[in-house]
Amino acid sequence: MLTAIRKNGLTLAIFACATTGLVALTQYLTEDQIKLQEQKQLLSVLNQVIPETMHDNALTQSCTLVTSPELGTMHAMPTYIATKNGEPTAIAIESIAPDGYNGEIKVITGIDNQGKILGTRVLSHQETPGLGDKIDLRVTSWILGFTGKQVTEDNWNSWKVRKDGGDFDQFTGATITPRAVIKAVRNTVNYVNQSRDEILSQPLNCAGDNQ
């Protein structure tokens, strides 16, 4: 009886070790592939907010981390520096809209040296399908309305939904979500306008990791 119990215990131990080893091996073999896929997805988004014609450097490897309350969080946010012939041409910066209807909304905005928005995309959100999710380009083209716009002292108050006297469309039954994104993009652009030199002087220290 005791011998049988020992044999069963040994069998279970061997099985557990084999299973653990197989999981570890699978993770090891797929880790590089996952990282490669993440880099491809990141590059695809970056090329949507900074045209490929505006840079000749590897954007995912030209990344620094910046911190400012205007980015909607006190966590350091990845910021990608586009250069051409060694000269900076644009910045793509991630930021947070902390006041979305269902929580935080993460966006990325490309901004040229004159403070003009080259493109904005939503990276992640939890907004209600059919209502707040219209901020997502896969659902509607609303997010494209930021392209070409600038943030100045004169037009600051126009960075609102039309219902509040601004220039941006709201969604039927979902005003909180666009308000949050508009405010986040405005504050992000304002931060870059005020801190461009400081951003460009930062060391490249996040190596394209989306932290």
Curated annotation (Swiss-Prot):
Segments traversing the membrane: 9-29
Entry keywords, A to Z: Cell inner membrane, Cell membrane, Electron transport, Flavoprotein, FMN, Membrane, Phosphoprotein, Translocase, Transmembrane, Transmembrane helix, Transport
EC numbers, comma separated: 7.-.-.-
Pfam families per record: FMN_bind
Keyword Plastid: no
Cellular location(s): Cell inner membrane
Major subcellular location class: membrane
Enzyme class: translocase
One function term, GO molecular function aspect: electron transfer activity
Residues that bear FMN phosphoryl threonine: T175
GO biological process, one term: electron transport chain
Record InterPro entries: FMN-bd (IPR007329), Ion_transpt_RnfG/RsxG (IPR010209)
GO cellular component annotations of the record: plasma membrane
Family membership: Belongs to the RnfG family.
Subunit structure as annotated in this protein's UniProt entry: The complex is composed of six subunits: RnfA, RnfB, RnfC, RnfD, RnfE and RnfG.
Function noted in UniProt: Part of a membrane-bound complex that couples electron transfer with translocation of ions across the membrane.
The protein's name in its UniProt record: Ion-translocating oxidoreductase complex subunit G
Organism taxonomic ancestry: Bacteria, Pseudomonadati, Pseudomonadota, Gammaproteobacteria, Vibrionales
Underlying gene: rnfG
